[in-house]
Design a protein with these regions (language model features):
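Single-stranded RNA-binding regions, centering on S1/OB-family and related RNA-binding modules
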Residues: 560-562, 571-716
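Flexible, glycine/charged-enriched surface loops at secondary-structure junctions
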Residues: 114-120, 155-157, 224-242, 273-274, ...
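Mobile "lid/hinge" segments at catalytic clefts and subdomain interfaces of large enzymes
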Residues: 151-267, 457-555
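Long, basic N-terminal domains or extensions that often function
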Residues: 2-243
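Glycine-rich, flexible beta-strand/loop modules in the N-terminal catalytic cores of phosphate-handling
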Residues: 24, 36-121, 126-128, 133, ...
Length: 716
């Protein structure tokens, strides 16, 4: 009996195409991952990303948040490589993968229903990588399309684009070569009407250029939104009904009516601890009054607190009043210090209200650069920024754990903000690491990290091109569309506000932006307003607080930092410096105590705790690669005598011949009549003959010396 085989058909297969920034974009549905709620294979150029979305059948019990997870998986087969790990498998997501997951999460999360509690998983797998076509953009588009055509409740779709700035011109989705010279890298995600996410790194770009880039991306995103809307109309599934999160509106209305005055009094303070203590005391009053009538009220307390506080904060802000009494354009009290820690290479303490960040800078040799094994073009990082957020910073008793996605994201934002002002390796041959320790948190810790890190780098003697400061902008909107923006948001304003628009930069321009939203997006008017008020604020922070603390980078690196010398040799002579089996360089390291790194282009970096060791190592290398200059005078030692002349060593292990006719002004019969082994003499380098031998002249050297002495010149 023969085996029966039936050819598999894909009756639900659909393909949609458009051109995006001059390259083909294809969305395929119905062929892969059919058991997911929806799956879209996005191919942009030769980049392919499979985007799958799934949702649980019922809500998760006992939670008051939306359980969304987003994973961006970097597969090394996408770039034709095998992982370098022991088992040759991809491990945990790298930093770039985590950051991309956050970039996908931030624009889609606010577009889910506020009372939706079903688990939702978004998984984007990079299966083919074309460095000219961003997998991040492909994943954003694919996620938007998958959610839009799925049966999962969601208020999309969105479109996504990157914008670069090359030779003063805005470029959509710049390719690999353009990105290398671009002064701007901004990712913009939009719905059909508003902007829902901005993530930017820039080389001190002015507000007008940044605004034009965002505006251009928002306009171009409408083409993607239109394509996905077409997909929804043709193959979209009806959205499923879900149990709405339980909420006791009757009890909440009673609490608001009876406790509004007490709640306002509790909120009206600039001290986070006082506010929380007052609120907890008021909750006890709720219990005393309502527990008998509503025995299940405890399950609603967190949501009651959130909604009640938001009601107060929103009303106050729309009236121009803030919980700590500040004006909308007023920054909390600031202070800045440097040299806080005695033995580190550089340190800066930046305090803004109850937010306090201690940043520490460390300098090391270039061998300490972080090596990267990812799908991206970047293979190493010379400047690294790490952000730590311990429990004690918010008064919580919890154990220390490895950095989470939030810590990695905040560290990357500060890193991106400062990278444009870090000196090039040719001017400052150090690997640089900054660690920002959040020791107290009441909002805007990432921006405090940027300010503190600028102080630490300047204290460490890193010659940054300009100081960088960061500030955040918040937003409250009324039901009629009117809005209020306010500067320097603290924790309670971040929690209950609708926007955290973080902008970092110098007085010249922007270096980084990160925008988080809790609403359905921003109009261009709000974005323009946020850019303007954050510029004014960061200039004040620089002029009034940071620059009076330390006006410019210290002229020298810390005495505890390694001393560095950079030199260049002919790449063909690298083997002479290294020696057979590394014998020569190992001897130099042993004699000098210095650490030596050699690049393939002949660049050599020498590092040591003291300058003397660096000088010893440099001299050893100089001696090895020494090439004399024709016509130059050298003071050398006679090492051998022959019948036809004397060999004079003009550098360690390097000698040349002074022919007998060149040993004296007059004729001599024997070499011994002019010199003996061990004598020191001046010689002039005459030539390298056809056999590579060095020819020297004592006679010509003395003639030149006498002429210089007669002219009053000093011989060195």
């Amino acid at each position: 009996m023969s085996t029966i085989i039936t050819k598999r058909q894909f009756p639900n297969y659909h393909k949609y195409t458009m051109e995006l920034a001059g390259r083909p974009l294809t969305l395929e549905v119905g062929k892969l991952a059919e058991l997911a709620n929806a799956a879209v294979m996005v191919t942009y150029g030769e980049t392919s990303v499979l985007c799958c979305v799934t949702a649980s059948a019922r809500p998760r019990d006992g939670i008051d948040f939306f359980p969304l997870s987003v994973d961006f998986e970097e597969k090394l087969y996408s770039v034709g490589r095998i992982p370098g790990s022991f088992n040759r498998r991809e491990g945990r997501p790298g930093e770039k993968g985590i950051l991309t997951s956050r970039v996908i999460d931030r624009p889609i999360r606010p577009l889910f229903p506020s009372d939706f509690r079903n688990d939702v998983s978004v998984m984007c797998t990079v299966m083919s990588m074309d460095h000219d076509c961003s997998p991040e953009i492909a994943a954003l588009i694919g996620t938007s399309a998958a959610l839009a055509i799925s049966d999962i409740p969601w208020n999309g779709p969105v479109g996504a684009l990157k914008v670069g700035l090359v030779d003063g011109e805005l470029v959509l989705n710049p390719n690999s070569e353009q990105r290398k010279v671009s002064d701007l890298d901004v990712t913009v995600v939009s719905t059909g009407k508003k902007v829902v996410m901005i993530e930017a790194g820039a080389n001190q770009v002015d507000n007008d250029t940044m605004y034009r880039a965002i505006q251009l991306a928002h306009q171009e995103n409408q083409k993607q939104v239109a394509l996905i809307n077409q997909m929804v109309s043709e193959i979209g599934k009806p959205k499923f009904d879900y149990p709405h999160a339980d909420f006791n509106q009757e009890l909440f209305d009673k609490i608001v009516h009876d406790f509004m005055d007490e709640a306002k009094a509790a909120m009206d303070t600039d001290d986070k601890n006082v506010r929380e203590a007052r609120w907890n005391e008021m909750i006890q009053h709720w219990h005393e009054k309502y527990l008998e009538e509503y025995p299940d009220m405890d399950q609603y307390l967190e949501e009651f607190t959130y909604k009640f506080q938001k009601k107060i904060v929103k009303a106050w802000l729309l009236e121009g009043h803030r919980v700590d009494g500040r004006q909308k354009n007023e920054i909390r009290p600031l202070s800045a210090e440097v040299g806080v820690l005695p033995r580190v290479h550089g340190s800066g303490l930046f305090t803004r209200g109850q937010t306090q960040v201690l940043s520490v800078a460390t300098l090391d040799t270039l061998s300490a650069c972080q090596k990267l094994d990812t799908i991206w073009e970047e293979t190493e990082k010379r400047y690294m920024h790490h952000y730590n957020f311990p429990g004690y910073s918010v008064g919580e008793a919890k154990p220390a754990r490895s950095p989470g996605r939030r810590e990695i994201g905040h560290g990357a934002l500060a890193e991106r903000a400062l990278l444009p002002v870090i000196p090039p390796v040719e001017e400052f041959p150090y690997a640089i690491r900054v660690v920002s320790e959040v020791v107290s948190s009441n909002g805007s810790t990432s921006q405090g990290s940027i300010c503190g890190s600028t102080l630490a780098l300047m204290d460490a003697g890193v010659p940054i091109s300009a100081p960088v400061a960061g500030i955040s902008c918040g937003l409250i909107q009324d039901d009629d569309g009117s809005f209020t923006t306010f500067i320097d948001i603290q924790g309670v304003e971040d929690f209950h506000g609708e926007m955290d628009f973080k902008v970092a930069g110098t007085k010249k321009g922007i270096t980084a932006i990160q925008m988080d939203l809790k609403n359905d997006g921003l109009t261009m008017e709000i974005i323009r307003n946020a850019l303007d008020i954050t510029y004014d604020a960061r200039c004040q922070i620089l002029d009034q607080i940071m620059l009076p603390c330390i006006a410019e980078p210290r002229p020298e690196v810390s005495k505890y930092a390694p001393k560095m010398i950079t030199m260049h040799i002919d790449p063909d002579r690298i083997r002479e410096v290294i020696g057979k089996g590394g014998s020569v360089i190992q001897k130099i390291v042993a004699e000098s105590g210095a650490k030596i790194d050699i690049d393939d282009d002949g660049t050599i970096h020498i590092a040591s705790p003291d300058a003397e060791s660096c000088a010893i190592a440099k001299k050893c290398i100089d001696d090895i690669v020494f090439v004399p200059e024709v016509g130059k005078l050298y003071y050398g030692r006679v090492v051998r005598l022959m019948t036809f002349g004397a060999f004079v060593e003009i550098a360690p292990g390097k000698d040349g011949l002074v022919h007998i006719s060149k040993l004296a002004d007059k004729r001599i019969e024997k070499v011994e009549d002019a010199c003996k082994v061990g004598d020191m003499m001046w010689v002039k380098f005459m030539e390298i003959d056809e056999k590579g031998r060095w020819n020297l002249s004592h006679k010509d050297a003395m003639k030149e010396i006498r002429a210089k002495e007669a002219a009053g010149e000093k011989i060195q």
